[in-house]
Regions:
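Rhodanese-like catalytic fold shared by cysteine-dependent sulfurtransferases
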Residues: 2-6, 10, 19-54, 84-88, ...
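A short, well-structured juxtamembrane/interface segment
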Residues: 52-66
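Short Gly/charged-rich anion-binding patches and loops
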Residues: 62, 78, 142
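Short, solvent-exposed loop/turn elements at domain surfaces
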Residues: 65, 82-85
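Flexible, glycine-rich surface segments
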Residues: 68-69, 88
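Short coil/turn segments at beta-strand junctions that form active-site/ligand-binding loops
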Residues: 70-75, 111-114
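Short hydrophobic beta-strand that contains or immediately precedes a catalytic carboxylate
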Residues: 73-78, 91-94
Length: 177
């Protein structure tokens, strides 16, 4: 009986030691760093952008009024496919995956330009053109943070959830499909 107990204790101790060492080995085998991906920097900018965003959210009426001002750009960062189905009249499409220094410099050379953004989660009752994302994955959030990261501070976001069929914002399909 004593021998069985010793063997059992030895096995348990060996298992516990191996389990405790596993996280250390995993840390040592971490993938190499990528200088083009900076999670800490992203989170810092995201927090700063979130504070900025608090005072840059617009009602439907204010969005409509400002969208008619000369020099204001309404930016739709959804896919071209969704943009072509339905978008705010006058909006310019720059898919989120295409937001780069070069494309922004081409489309918005002046970082002081007023930019109005909206996304899928601003419209309901048209899932084909505006498929709903999880609230924490809303394209407005990613777009706002990206523009802020690239130095654009005159960015305003459409705040409310609107019915695509009754909104005062004119929604149109692209004619160049």
């Amino acid at each position: 009986m004593k021998t069985k107990l010793r063997v059992l204790m030895y096995c348990a101790l060996t298992y516990c030691t191996a389990a405790a060492a596993a996280p250390m080995q995993a840390r040592e085998a971490a993938p190499p760093a990528n200088p083009q991906i900076d999670m800490r920097g992203y989170l810092a900018v995201a927090n700063e952008a979130a504070a900025h965003r608090n005072t840059h959210r617009l009602s439907e009426a204010d969005f409509l009024r400002l969208s008619n001002d000369p020099g204001t750009v309404v930016l739709d960062a959804r896919s071209k496919e969704k943009y072509d189905l339905l978008h705010v009249r006058g909006a310019v499409n720059l898919s989120f995956s295409d937001i780069t220094v070069a494309r922004l410099a081409q489309l918005l050379p002046n970082k002081d330009t007023r930019i109005l953004i909206y996304c899928n989660n601003n419209f309901r009752n048209n899932e084909l053109a505006f498929p709903t994302k999880m609230a924490t994955a809303s394209l407005n959030l990613s777009t706002y943070i990206a523009l802020y990261t690239y130095g654009y501070r005159n960015v305003y976001e459409l705040a409310p959830l609107l019915d695509a069929g009754t909104t005062k914002l004119e929604l149109v399909a692209s004619t160049r499909r």
